[in-house]
Structure formats: C-alpha cells, structure tokens
Swiss-Prot record:
An example Gene Ontology molecular-function term: lipid-linked peptidoglycan transporter activity
Coiled-coil boundaries: none
Upper classification of the organism: Bacteria, Pseudomonadati, Pseudomonadota, Gammaproteobacteria, Alteromonadales
Native organism: Pseudoalteromonas atlantica (strain T6c / ATCC BAA-1087)
Protein name (database record): Probable peptidoglycan glycosyltransferase FtsW
Metabolic or biological pathway: Cell wall biogenesis; peptidoglycan biosynthesis
InterPro entries registered for this protein in UniProt: Cell_cycle_FtsW-rel_CS, FtsW, FtsW/RodA
Biological-process GO terms, alphabetical: cell wall organization; FtsZ-dependent cytokinesis; peptidoglycan biosynthetic process; regulation of cell shape
Gene name of this polypeptide: ftsW
Similarity-based family: Belongs to the SEDS family. FtsW subfamily.
GO cellular component: cell division site; plasma membrane
Length: 487
C-alpha cells in the first residue's frame, strides 16, 4: 500500500473544501517521523564513535558495530513502514494472539535461549538473534489496551476487573525474572500502572498497586546479591571505584569531561575501553563527553517531543471515540519516557543500573526494531484519525452542496403559487381596511346628526325661556295687587 495512494485524495479533498488550505496535505505526521529519524542518525554517529576501540580489538574492524547498527536501522525503518500499512483494526482484533506469541517467545528463551554475561535473554533464529523481551513488551501493551476497551466498566467499578490484567503481567514478570531481566519488569510495571490510572482506575487501587509493585521490586533486589551490589555502588560508587562502582565512576568522569559543549566527536577518552558497554547501555555518557550538556539536552528534547506527541495522540483518539488507539498511544508514550529516564538516570548516577537501552539511540537490533515499530504504530494512529477527519469534512461538504442544489432546483410553479397567495392576502387586507374606513365614516355622520339635533333642541328651549320672562314683566291689575295685599 503506497503512501501516494492516500496522499492524492487527501490533497484533492482539502483543495476542494478549503480555498486557503496549503497546497500539500501530508497524510502522515512528518514531524514525528523526522524526530525518530533524527534520533537514529545521532545514534549511528555516537555508536560508531563509541564502538571503534572495542570493535578493533574484537573483530579487527573499527566499523564492525557501526555497520551492524546501520543494518539494524534499515531493518527498523522497514519494520516501521510495514506497521504503518497495517490497519489499527487488525491490532484490535489480534491483541490476544500477540499476547500468546509474547508468552511463547519468553518461554522459548528459557528453553533454547543463548546466555550472555550470565543472562539468558537472546533467542537465535538462524543468523538472527532476538531479545524476546522487546517484542513481548509491545505485545503486552497491545493486549492491555484491548482489555481496557473490552472491560472498561469492570476495571473502573470493581477490583476483579482491575486485577485481571495484573495476573497476565505477573506471568510475564515471572518469565522475565527467570532470565533474569528486572529492568524490563520495572518498565512494564510502571507502564501498566500509568495506563490503568489513565483508564480511570480508582485511586486506592492505583496507590495499592504502586505500593505492592515497589515492595516486590525491593524484595527482588534484596533477594539477589548482584542487585544489592548495584544498589550499594549506586549510593556510593567511589567507595569501590575499581570494583562494584567501576562502571558508574567511569560514566561520571565522562559526564564531567563533557562540560557544556563537549570534547568533540571522536575525542572521548572513556570509550577507550575504560567504560564497559559504552555503545549500548552507557551511550549517553559517551555522548555527554563528546557533545557536552548541549548534546544531551538536544537528544532529551527530541525524545520529549516524541513522548508529548504520543500523549497528544492518545487524548485526540479518546475525543474521536477510538479508545484502543488512545490507550496504545498512551502506553508507548509512558514506555519511551520511563525507559529514557532509567537509562539516563543510571548512566548519570541518579538511578541504579538496569541494563536498559536508550530508545532509538543505543546499539541493539531488537530494541531498535521494536522501538521503530512502536513509532510506526503512532504514525498509523495519527494517519487514521486524519483520514477520518477529512472524510467527515467531505461528508459535510457534500451535505451542504446537496442542500444548496435542492434550494436552487425548486420548481417555478411553487414560487408563482406563493406569489399569488401573497397577493390574495394583500387584497383581503386592503378590502378589510376599506370596510373599516367606511364604517368609521358612517359612525361619524350619525354622531354629527345627533349633535345637530341636540343643538336645535337647545335653541328652541332658550327661545321658550325668553318668552316666559317677557310675559312675567307686564303690570298686574289693581284687583290682583289688592288681592296680594289682602293675602
């Protein structure tokens, strides 16, 4: 499935719907891809510089590890491109089978694995050597994301749903501790705790799990003598600088020599076989010595951007009602951030050494390929959300277009009938007004007639009164006067 297959329709949709849209619409998050490639490129340079002395001694070829790391980068990019073409629906439906595959790999390592430095962590398949814990981590996080989607209400409402994924984690932890690989167990435990908390687990369950996990890790450290030596050397490495604290003291000297801008590429002294595992677990010490505080800050900033993008994708996926994608993105972000913190903290003397690589930077084929595949998953999650959003825009645009066309295509008969109705109503109103005016005129005429009749009646009454007054003033006769006097 080619990228251009999706890019052309996406660009056409944006160009059609948005006049001010950019000319090129990218179907993938290019910034995330560039961040991952930048870390890989820096890792190739630092691995080449840090591994040259030991490669010259072991293989008589100073570029032995550099060539192998370059091949791993090519394979990692191929794995990321492959994952980018797999729909998220496949990961949702296949997470249980992936979990089973992870368990099979961990069991196979214990049965037919290869031991290096007292640890049985590698599984040889022909010329390829796989560290089974790396794919097992990714498969477990896929299963946990699917479980939280299927059992969300059960996880948030009762302890039974909260405890079920912990049983699966316990099975993984036992198999990993038999290798032994405590660092991977701690990373998986912290990622599980963080993901359950983000999924809405109750606080008392969250703190209970954190306390139980911390107590279990403490017990495991005290149970093994070599782990106790790591703790004591971490607390005071200078107490035994040529024994248990040797690796950490050499790492601290590398950090100290780096200063702000470092000694320059290739000018490290600690890589001259003073610092063991300089190109793997302690690659940040060599980077700090050669590139200084500025180089360390740059690498940490690149990783921080990847982690923030993963967490932002998780939040956006939840808003788009894609919970599986959200929980998987969250788990990748927590995984990357915690493993980075442990790697840098161990090399800087802040945390005990755990044997964890720096994501996308350290030498190691299994770690690099799985980390790149995880980045490919993030790109795929973002891609599907972009396609979903553009399809929504396209559907809304089509709905608006159909609405406007239906309005334009209304028949003229309907509009003429409407005009006739309006004119009829206006005529009725006019007739009603005329009738009202005529009625008012008739009322006024009747009032005027009544007023005129009243005026004429008043005139007649006044004339009658005047006539009666004039008759009362005439002289009466003597007989009347005598009668008046007699009376």
């Amino acid at each position: 499935m080619n990228t251009s297959t999706f890019a052309t329709p996406l660009r056409a949709m944006f160009a059609q719907r948005h006049d001010a849209a950019p000319a090129v619409v990218r179907p993938y998050d290019v910034s995330l891809i560039l961040l991952a490639l930048s870390l890989m490129a820096i890792g190739l340079v630092i691995v080449t510089s840090a591994s040259m002395p030991v490669a010259s001694r072991l293989f008589d070829n100073p570029f032995h590890f550099a060539i192998r790391h370059g091949i791993y980068i090519v394979l990692a990019i191929g794995a990321a491109l492959t994952v980018m073409q797999i729909p998220m629906q496949w990961w949702r439906t296949s997470n249980a089978w992936l979990l089973l595959l992870g368990l099979v790999l961990l069991i196979a390592v214990l049965l037919v694995g290869r031991s290096v430095n007292g640890s049985t962590r590698w599984l040889a398949i022909g010329p390829i050597t796989i560290q089974a814990a790396e794919p097992a981590k990714l498969f477990f996080f896929c299963y946990l994301a699917g479980y939280l989607v299927r059992r969300y209400e059960e996880v948030t409402e009762n302890i039974k749903g909260f405890a079920k994924p912990l049983v699966v984690f316990f099975a993984f932890a036992v198999l990993l501790l038999l290798q032994p690989d405590l660092g991977t167990v701690v990373v998986m435990l912290c990622t599980t705790i963080g993901l359950l908390f983000l999924a809405g687990a109750k606080l008392w369950q969250f703190f209970g799990l954190a306390f139980t996990g911390g107590a279990a890790v403490t017990f495991l450290i005290m149970f093994e003598e070599y782990r106790m030596k790591r703790i004591t050397s971490f607390l005071d490495p200078w107490a035994d600088p040529f024994g248990s604290g040797y690796q950490l003291t050499q790492s601290l000297m590398a950090y100290g020599r780096g200063d702000v801008f470092g000694q320059g590429l290739g000018n490290s002294l600690q890589k001259l076989e003073y610092l063991p595992e300089a190109h793997t677990d302690f690659i940040m010490a060599i980077l700090a010595e050669e590139l200084g505080f500025a180089g360390v800050l740059t690498v940490l900033a690149l990783m921080l951007c990847i982690v923030l993008k993963a967490m932002k994708m998780g939040s956006k996926a939840l808003q788009n009602e894609r919970p599986f994608d959200a929980y998987l993105a969250y788990s990748i972000g927590i995984w990357f951030s915690f493993q980075t913190a442990v790697n840098v903290g161990a090399s800087a003397g802040i945390l005990p050494t755990k044997g964890l690589t720096f994501p996308l930077l350290s030498y190691g084929g299994s770690s690099l390929i799985i980390m790149a595949a995880a980045v490919g998953l993030l790109v795929r999650i973002d891609f599907e959300m972009r396609v979903e959003g553009i399809q929504a825009i396209d559907r809304s645009g089509k709905a608006k277009a159909s609405t406007s066309s239906s309005r334009k295509n209304k028949p003229k008969t309907a509009s003429s009938a409407g005009k006739k109705k309006v004119s009829t109503v206006l005529d009725d109103v006019a007739y009603a007004v005329v009738d009202d005016v005529q009625d008012e005129e008739q009322d006024i005429d009747s009032i005027m007639d009544d007023f005129a009749q009243d005026e004429s009646a008043q005139t007649v009454s006044h004339q009658t009164k005047r006539a009666s007054k004039s008759t009362s003033k005439t002289p009466r006769g003597k007989d009347e006067e005598q009668e008046d006097g007699y009376v």
